Amino acid sequence: MIAIIVVAILATAGRSDKICIGYHANNSTTQIDTILEKNVTVTHSVELLENQKEERFCKILKKAPLDLKGCTIEGWILGNPQCDLLLGDQSWSYIVERPTAQNGICYPGVLNEVEELKALIGSGERVERFEMFPKSTWTGVDTSSGVTRACPYNSGSSFYRNLLWIIKTKSAAYSVIKGAYNNTGNQPILYFWGVHHPPDTNEQNTLYGSGDRYVRMGTESMNFAKSPEIAARPAVNGQRGRIDYYWSILKPGETLNVESNGNLIAPWYAFRFVSTSNKGAVFKSNLPIENCDATCQTVAGVLRTNKTFQNVSPLWIGECPKYVKSESLRLATGLRNVPQIETRGLFGAIAGFIEGGWTGMIDGWYGYHHENSQGSGYAADRESTQKAVDGITNKVNSIIDKMNTQFEAVDHEFSNLERRIDNLNKRMEDGFLDVWTYNAELLVLLENERTLDLHDANVKNLYERVKSQLRDNAMILGNGCFEFWHKCDDECMESVKNGTYDYPKYQDESKLNRQEIESVKLESLGVYQILAIYSTVSSSLVLVGLIIAVGLWMCSNGSMQCRICI
């Protein structure tokens, strides 16, 4: 009878009201790395790195790029005859140079500081081409016969459209020629000149005459003087001679003076920079140019994103994310995603004391599950969830600001220095990128660890808040759950959730129920002890009886001799 009562009471206790603290889980398979772990599955995360692109060139701020087509930068800017379609004023958002372009420097030679020139041209947005030194500037010399088969046009010999190859006339010696140009405008002027180096003395004498020859150029900020270097060289493009090509900038208010008595490749047409930008670019690519608009253009294509970083290309123009070498910069915003195991039931942790998250709780990160006579259900704790959301949002913005500060520091450092030093900065940029990439990855790993720890702490805090309210009015089940010693209807459950639980109100009922359960447990323990003693004694008597019976049987059939001595 006592055992039946115990079973009945325990069964009733199994249907007691309960409340559990838990956290959100979902079907996400997204994984992040932390400073201590790799491939941690989380409920929510944000990828800071863009890696998708549209493989085409578009307009930037409604301004089209300049397609050099079959010409190189050198061929266009010097005026290769095959690049006549590019003559005239030009404007662009950026310049596209094709890797297969063949029309560059036609008469063999080297353009001095070409990379710096490309950086300068890339920073321009609009240029006006004008005649700087008309042919009439140079008297007593031939300004029309300086052509070469190396620079053909319409099957005949020609020369660069922006340079003038000056040679002596057949009837007179090459006299000293002089020219001057004063930049009275407000824009800087890009101009070119060259020095011809014949392969032998015969060609030198034929073109310029015998004797020492020189080319001199000078402004308020530049001085140049060079004499021809006559030497035998291998043929390139059918020519054994060479031309050294030079360029410079004539600043507003400066005057360019030219003087030569031979071997001068004189400036003819020049470019006036009407509009410049510090964010220009020259892209070398075969991507098509299409009638489209973009805010971010890279050499690899268009980016359309609101992400902070990209790993598509370090060469870009427009409003683009910063480039890093990382494959991913995924920042955790949610919790570890550990959905509960069905066989373990509902009650069960993050933080070491709840075994799994709740996929049924969808309106918050942390919350409750209750069970009473009126039913059961989930409810999110909106206050702790909102605080966590705000904190993580601020964290994401803070990380972005920290990374942007790293990137912008060096740019500001070089912004007011000469272009040559700025170019050196670009060459060093790859090394800076390694450091920035490492810093970005390390920062994300550290913040991911902190985010998961934050969620852990928030669940624990919620658990401790409930525990401090219930005290001994509920039994701790040890898995994030509490079993009430009293009846707790929906109103009671709500008071626990919102922190207004009235402990004294339920104290007496809880105490009484707790004592009854403990009493039944003690009585049931006594019954079990009596049954255990009875069972032990009974088993011993049966065993002794069996031994005696076997002994008598063996004595009766002679298998064992029995002697009784008195």
Swiss-Prot record:
Signal found in the keyword field: yes
Transmembrane segments: 530-550
Cysteines engaged in disulfide bonds, as pairs: 20-481, 58-292, 71-83, 106-151, 296-320, 488-492
Signal peptide: 1-16
Side of membrane Cytoplasmic, spans: 551-566
InterPro entries: Capsid_hemagglutn, Hemagglutn_HA1_a/b_dom_sf, Hemagglutn_influenz_A, Hemagglutn_influenz_A/B
Post-translation changes: Palmitoylated.
Site feature: Cleavage: 344-345
Protein localization: Virion membrane; Host apical cell membrane
Annotated function: Binds to sialic acid-containing receptors on the cell surface, bringing about the attachment of the virus particle to the cell. This attachment induces virion internalization of about two third of the virus particles through clathrin-dependent endocytosis and about one third through a clathrin- and caveolin-independent pathway. Plays a major role in the determination of host range restriction and virulence. Class I viral fusion protein.
Family, similarity comment: Belongs to the influenza viruses hemagglutinin family.
Name of the molecule in the record: Hemagglutinin
Species of provenance: Influenza A virus (strain A/Shearwater/Australia/1972 H6N5)
Taxonomic lineage from the root: Viruses, Riboviria, Orthornavirae, Negarnaviricota, Polyploviricotina
Gene transcribed to yield this protein: HA
